[in-house]
Amino acid sequence: MSAEAVPQILVPLCPANPLQPGQDIIVYLRPESNGILTESVLFKVLSNPQWKEKLTLSYLANLPGEFILRHRIVEHHYAVRLDFAARGRSAFTPSMRSALERFFGIPFDKAQILGAFEALQLLRLSAEELFQLWVPVYDILEIEGQLVKRLHDNVFVINYDIPALLHKNHAGTDVAVMLFRTTLDYDGFRPLIERIRDNLIQANMLDPTKTERRVFHYSKGPFEQLLDGLGYLWKSATERASLADLQFAQFLHAKGCTDEQILRYLTHPIGVLETGERRLEQNLFSFTLFDSYEEAWRKTLNFSQDF
């Protein structure tokens, strides 16, 4: 009987230090990418003195596909989007219905809205075929962190990419995960991403018409840093990273937030922003995209999940 696959931890997790400035940015490679070659391109860029002095590699591990499946890491990571893909039409909030009507110019009641899994059956497509189904850019809408694609005859599919994401993560695909601690803000970090993207294109590992997220993911905001960290950072085969290990969580703790509050932000990110007389529905991940820790925390002060 073969032993269970466990993470290969090359650089153990360095716990967060609330007295040390900087933020966590987690990077992990897509399972369909060529991991070894992609890592080579990535570390070649990072070895440049321009970036090396501003980044600290605080974790590096390889997560076996079998381990990812066993712990349902992908399902937990995409839990909110997975819920919308499963429930389809019934998952839409009133604000989301209005946004769809405004963007596509069709009454919500007249639209045939399918969750991604229902669409696979009705349209008789594979997960990859649904994901790759081309439509013009004006037929794709992001609402509250959910992706809606309009097909023919006013058929709409919500989170059409989720089945393919789940399918690509299987026992034979390993994922390399890195944590970088950096004093760079997101404006300063973006040129690094562009340099990596350019090098991937030069190495024929990325289609110039596609975004870098086809090859790798990086945390795009403080709350996504927490989501990525709790899902993909493992101290051992049995112990995940905790909130105490992550810089933004330490920052929130210092502001008086409890673990329970923080975890609720991650599991129920859609809420209402109270701005005077206005009540604006927001997804906290989208709302704090590329924010500093201070900016993201301030936005939570008027954010309510009871609506």
What would you call each of these model-derived segments?
Residues 1-307:
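Non-catalytic terminal and connector segments of soluble metabolic enzymes
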